Amino acid sequence: GFENYDLSCLKHSVTAGEALNTDIAERFRKATGLVIREGFGQTETTVMIANLPGYDVRPGSIGKPVPQYNVELLDNDGNLAKPGEIGEITIKIDKDKEYPYGLFTEYYNGEESTKEVFYDSHYHTGDEAWMDEDGFYYFVGRKDDVIKSSGYRIGPFEIEAVILRLPYVVECAITGVPHETRGQVVKATVVLQKGVKPSESLVKEIQNFVKENTAPYKYPRIVEFVDSIPRTTNGK
């Protein structure tokens, strides 16, 4: 644990790449006294949204847009999303102003791929978030990963974060499974702690815990227990 290390010289801590689980952030704070400052960016950009020094970090928030980018959250119709509404994170490009520093201009030998992300005077990240009344952003997930069930848009990360709070859960992945009438239903793939045996009662416990800690329609209708969850080479 952290108690075995001298962290007295540690002044700041930041994270990016994957959404930060709030439970992990709180455990880190208790162990070190530091708040992790989460941010958001892509290979195609520099950091776009961040909890900069001076911000009061809000649990689960990736912060506010950095000054160099005109970040806009757009709904499916291309309009600005209202506070609390999920939208795509984009960078507005004003032809009358200098091109945004740090934003790439094109994919190498990828004309069609470039056109897919640059249109309607915006660079489209393909990532979704929502914003609170004070302008703080909260990451939801990739547009392709958002689950559409019975007219609801469900972000996988929120459900994963809740299930990971259960003491007997090691890992969790949330995906959408095709459904004849609902379009998709939520599926939870779960890795349990050693010694914990899968059971129907455990499935019900996980489902009820999600219902109690999120909106009831977000609970996983399918729960599968596995020994491990496959990851890409960069750990995602």
Which residues make up each language-model segment?
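Gly/Ser/Thr-rich phosphate-binding loop
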Residues: F2-R58, N70, D77
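Glycine-centered tight turns that cap/initiate beta-strands
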Residues: C9, G33, Q68, Y168-E171, ...
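Active-site glycine-centered loops adjacent to acidic/histidine catalytic or metal-binding residues
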Residues: G17, G41, G63, D127, ...
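Beta-strand->loop->alpha-helix junctions that form or flank phosphate-binding loops
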Residues: R37-E44, M48, G63-P65, T175-P178, ...
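Short, P/G- and charge-enriched loop/turn segments at secondary-structure junctions
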Residues: Y55-S61, E116-V117
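Conserved ATP/PPi-binding loop(s) of AMP-dependent carboxylate-activating enzymes
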Residues: P65-Q68, N79-E116, I154
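Hydrophobic alpha-helical segments, especially N-terminal targeting/anchoring helices
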Residues: L74-D75, P83, T125, M131, ...
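AMP-binding/adenylate-forming catalytic core of the ANL superfamily
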Residues: K95, S113, E128-K218, G235
